[in-house]
């Protein structure tokens, strides 16, 4: 049988004392139950933390007590109803039930508030420059065609050829619209004629996806749209149309509206200005549909050129599109606005191909026999060309330009142009190699 091992610390004491002795013993009774703290941390700061639910209750009780005190002492009127929590993305505007706004409209309104003075102020035009530009304007300009004119021509073609169904149609066939479609887009027309902010009708947003989008657009009467509706329409068509179709929208809808607004108010509405900037999303269509037709019309005023030119200055434009536009402007018949656009494009300091530079030089050399007094804008454009690209000119071009200065002088600008040309090293002059003996 194994030996019994006594417990440690007991010594010679009895294993179990009598119950009476245990009760009477003072060291056997504990004063209280030991509190166990598990998972509460050791810092007092954590024990004093108030949870979010308790915080809300405290604030609610404090608010109720404050309202009771104000009502009891008569220091406050009827407590105001709790204000609904709203997320505001822009400045407050009076609206009639238009809670859902377009995602970019608050940004546009904020920009209008910040820059309204700059764009709504009248453009300062020098009378002398304006008279000089009018001398080079086309005296018999071609009639301006709008989208309505082209649609009516196509409708007339369709009516004359309706008898021969299988014949070759020279124009775009214009099918008759369903009466329900006409009713829908006449309703869209009413919305766009009064549009200020908010979302556009879904029927209008799907127009770029339609094959006969021009005919549908004609039903909505773009000339009756508000400026804000024109901006939103430009956003939609610039994003969803192909470049060729976007060019037609710019040329037939946006450009006539911009020119009419400038001619009537002597300034451009801010929303139309933003529409011109948004149209640069497709730079090729912008040049072919807005800038080039504006120059080719021969009736571009100085005010129009300054407004459109400011967009060229502010926006980034790919070099290929700018080079093609400069080449086209240099080869067309001259008008005063051409010098403004060329100077602004030259100031962007692109690495232009030699073909474009040669076309620009020939453009200026074509004025050697000009009898009319050239405007200051023409001399400023020539100075910009020489300052930016004097190292890319050939020797014969440099000599021809010096001869041009003698034939078409300007008292202030010609000496500066001559100094730039004389200090430049032509591109066809090679460096003399250094020989070491």
Swiss-Prot record:
One of its GO terms (biological process) is regulation of protein localization to nucleolus. HeLa cells lacking BYSL show a delay in the processing of the 18S rRNA component of the 40S ribosomal subunit. HT-H cells lacking BYSL show trophinin-independent signaling through ERBB4. This is Bystin. The modification Omega-N-methylarginine is found at residue 40. Belongs to the bystin family. The gene is BYSL. The modification Phosphoserine is found at residues 55, 98, 167, 414. GO terms for molecular function: RNA binding; snoRNA binding. Residues 71-87 have a biased composition (Basic and acidic residues). Residues 1-105 are annotated as: Disordered. GO terms for cellular component: apical part of cell; chromosome; cytoplasm; cytosol; intracellular membrane-bounded organelle; membrane; nucleolus; nucleoplasm. The modification Phosphothreonine is found at residue 156. Required for processing of 20S pre-rRNA precursor and biogenesis of 40S ribosomal subunits. May be required for trophinin-dependent regulation of cell adhesion during implantation of human embryos. Binds trophinin, tastin and cytokeratins. Found in the placenta from the sixth week of pregnancy. Was localized in the cytoplasm of the syncytiotrophoblast in the chorionic villi and in endometrial decidual cells at the uteroplacental interface. After week 10, the level decreased and then disappeared from placental villi. It comes from Homo sapiens (Human). It is found in: Cytoplasm; Nucleus, Nucleolus. Keywords: Cytoplasm, Methylation, Nucleus, Phosphoprotein, Ribosome biogenesis.
């Amino acid at each position: 049988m194994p030996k019994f091992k006594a417990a440690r610390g007991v010594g010679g004491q009895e294993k179990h004392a009598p119950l009476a002795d245990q009760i009477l013993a003072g060291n056997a009774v504990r004063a209280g139950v030991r509190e166990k703290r598990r998972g509460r941390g050791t810092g007092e700061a954590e024990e004093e933390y108030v949870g979010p639910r308790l915080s809300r209750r405290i604030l609610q009780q404090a608010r109720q007590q404050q309202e009771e005190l104000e009502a009891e002492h008569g220091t406050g009127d009827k407590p105001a109803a709790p204000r609904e929590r709203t997320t505001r993305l822009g400045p407050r505007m009076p609206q009639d039930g238009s809670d859902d706004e377009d995602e970019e409209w608050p940004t546009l309104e904020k920009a209008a508030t910040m820059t309204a003075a700059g764009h709504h102020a009248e453009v300062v035009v020098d009378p002398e420059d304006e008279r000089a530009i009018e001398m080079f304007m086309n005296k018999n300009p071609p009639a301006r065609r709008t989208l309505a004119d082209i649609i009516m021509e196509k409708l007339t073609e369709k009516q004359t050829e309706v008898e021969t169904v299988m014949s070759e149609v020279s124009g775009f066939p214009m099918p008759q619209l369903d009466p329900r479609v006409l009713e829908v887009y006449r309703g869209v027309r009413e919305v766009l004629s009064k549009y200020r902010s908010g979302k556009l009708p879904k029927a209008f947003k799907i127009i770029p996806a339609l094959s006969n989008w021009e005919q549908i657009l004609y039903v909505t009467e773009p000339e009756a749209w508000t400026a804000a509706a024109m901006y939103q329409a430009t956003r939609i068509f610039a994003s969803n149309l192909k470049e060729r179709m976007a060019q037609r929208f710019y040329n037939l809808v946006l450009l006539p509206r911009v020119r009419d607004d400038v001619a009537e108010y002597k300034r451009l509405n801010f929303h139309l200005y933003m529409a011109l900037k948004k149209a640069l999303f497709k730079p090729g269509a912008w040049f072919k549909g807005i800038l080039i037709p504006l120059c080719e019309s021969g009736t571009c005023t100085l005010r129009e050129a300054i407004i459109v030119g400011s967009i060229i200055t502010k926006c980034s434009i790919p070099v290929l599109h700018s080079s093609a536009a400069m080449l086209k402007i240099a080869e067309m018949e001259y008008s005063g606005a051409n010098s403004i656009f060329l100077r602004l494009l030259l100031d962007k300091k692109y690495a232009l191909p030699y073909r474009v530079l040669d076309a620009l030089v020939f453009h200026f050399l074509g004025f050697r026999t000009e009898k009319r007094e050239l405007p200051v804008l023409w001399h400023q454009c020539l100075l910009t060309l020489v300052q930016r690209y004097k190292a890319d000119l050939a020797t014969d071009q440099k000599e021809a330009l010096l001869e041009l200065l003698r034939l078409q002088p300007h008292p202030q600008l010609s000496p500066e142009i001559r100094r730039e040309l004389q200090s430049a090293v032509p591109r066809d002059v090679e460096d003399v190699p250094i020989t070491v003996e």
